[in-house]
Amino acid sequence: MVLVKICGLMHSEDILAVNTAGADFAGFVFAPGRHQISLEQALSLKQLLHPKIKTVGVFVNEPVAEILAIYQAGAIDVAQLHGKSTPTEITQFQQAGLKVIQVFERQAIDLTSMADYLMVDSGKGSGQLLNLKAIPHISRPLILAGGLTPLNVRQAVQLVQPTMVDVSSGVETNGHKDADKITQFIQQAKEDIIYEDIK
C-alpha cells in the first residue's frame, strides 16, 4: 500500500489532522517560503505527533552541518533535499543515521543517486501536476509530488505506482491545511485500486 506524506505542517491543528487521518510521514519545511518553520516550532509540533509518523525536514541547498544539527536535536527522521546534493553529502547524512530523499524536478531522475528515496516533483511549490505517463517505472523507492489533490491522487497512484505520494497545497483551503481534505487524500491514496481495464 502506498505511503502518504503531508508536507508544510505549521500548527497544532495540522498535527491533529495528520494523526487522525493516519499519515505515514509529516513534512516540516525549513527552507524559506510560506510554510517555513523554526527548529523550535518543529520540536513542539513533533511532540504532538503520533509516534508512528516519521518526520521529514525539507531543505534547499542547506549546509550539511545545519541539517545534521536539526536531526540531532530530534526534529526529523528524514531529510528531503532540493537543489544540488553530492554523493558525499548524502553519505554523510546516512552515516549519521538520517535517511535521505533526493528531489528531481520533472522526469530528470538520477538512478545513480545514493539517496534512500527518489522524489519526482513538478518544481518547488508550483502545484502543477506532472505528465504521469512520462515518469519511468523504476525499482528504486519513488515518491511522487507536485499538483496532487484528493481528486487526482488515486489515478496518479494507479499510473505511476510510487512508494509514496507527497502533498502540501493540495490539501489546503485558503492557504491553511484542511483536515477533511487530508482525510480524503489519504483515503484515496490508500484505497485498494481495481484495474478496471484488465478483463
Swiss-Prot record:
EC number: 5.3.1.24
Cysteine-cysteine disulfides: none
Record-linked Gene3D superfamilies: Aldolase class I
This protein's UniProt keywords: Amino-acid biosynthesis, Aromatic amino acid biosynthesis, Isomerase, Tryptophan biosynthesis
UniProt pathway: Amino-acid biosynthesis; L-tryptophan biosynthesis; L-tryptophan from chorismate: step 3/5
Molecular function in Gene Ontology: phosphoribosylanthranilate isomerase activity
Alphabetical GO biological process terms: L-tryptophan biosynthetic process
Catalysed reactions, as listed in the record: N-(5-phospho-beta-D-ribosyl)anthranilate = 1-(2-carboxyphenylamino)-1-deoxy-D-ribulose 5-phosphate
Family the entry assigns: Belongs to the TrpF family.
Protein name listed in UniProt: N-(5'-phosphoribosyl)anthranilate isomerase
Species, as recorded: Lacticaseibacillus paracasei (strain ATCC 334 / BCRC 17002 / CCUG 31169 / CIP 107868 / KCTC 3260 / NRRL B-441)
Gene this protein is translated from: trpF
